[in-house]
Amino acid sequence: MIVGAAGRVGSSLARSFPEATCLKRGDLDVGDPCTVARFGWSRDDVVLNAAGYTDVDAAQSRAGSAAAWRTNHVGAANLAQAAIRHRFVLLHLSTDYVFSGRTTGAISEDAPVDPLNVYGESKAAGDSEVARTPRHYIVRTSWVVGEGENFVRRMLRLAHAGQRPTIVDDQFGRLTFADDLCAAIRHLVVHRPAFGTYNVTNDGTPATWAAIARKVFIAAGRRDEDVSGRTTREFLAEFPKKAERPLNSVLDLGKARGVGIELHDWEPRLKEYLERELTR
């Protein structure tokens, strides 16, 4: 069963698991404990939780914060209780935003969480609820490129519109393409390595958002210099209501590799993605 099947990753999971029952929010509101408790879970051996409130900046507002905590923490807790009661495997999607990104080097699964914003706080709290279940996978990922709006599509639009954007150039990470993330999730579900937390992103040399934007612009026929860089500090000074982001979002992929998950380099995947987008 896929919960949150209409979202950026959920819709990709639905394609990757055609045999699954797909639930959208109208089918199951994970934030409502009574609804989750009454749901007919006994038929399902594995539940993939892709439900999440992911508007990082809106989560800083009062209404957004309430929505983030309701879905990301309370929703995860409700599913965790159902997993214990009905003994199904719960696979839960997490994020690099549970970390501050103030350390250097790749971040391991057992690094202490230290979120910088409400979204990260709510996700970290949800992770801790899922971790209490005996049969769980927490899949931490970052910088997802999937269905609907994403950074690469936004940069393509700017490139085609003749814009010259200024993009943050001191946050490092790797893109994660949704299809590759879903393939890794299928590997966990099918092969059942040890339960626990796994970092899953695309592999390759980390880059900044500005560096990725320049690659997109070049693919669209523009030039490197059409994308300017700036620091996160400068960005937040201009947009003080935006949520603070980690400077280091590079996740250690050793554990995932160790259980046989194939992790493709993000740069060839970006090239393939852009070729598809540019011929649409």
Task: List where the protein language model places each region.
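N-terminal Rossmann NAD(P)H-binding glycine-rich loop of SDR-like oxidoreductase domains
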Residues: 1-18
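Active-site loop of classical SDR/Rossmann-like NAD(P)-dependent oxidoreductases
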Residues: 8, 208-209, 232-254, 265
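Adenosine-cofactor binding site in Rossmann-like domains, unifying the SAM/SAH pocket
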Residues: 18-38
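NAD(P)H-binding glycine-rich loop region in Rossmannoid oxidoreductase-like domains
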Residues: 33-73, 84
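Catalytic helix-loop patch of NAD(P)-dependent Rossmann-fold dehydrogenases
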Residues: 70, 74-75, 85, 98-139, ...
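NAD(P)-dependent short-chain dehydrogenase/reductase
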Residues: 131-180
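Mid/C-terminal beta-alpha module of Rossmann-like enzyme folds, strongest
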Residues: 191-241, 274
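C-terminal amphipathic/interface module of NAD(P)-dependent oxidoreductases
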Residues: 244-280
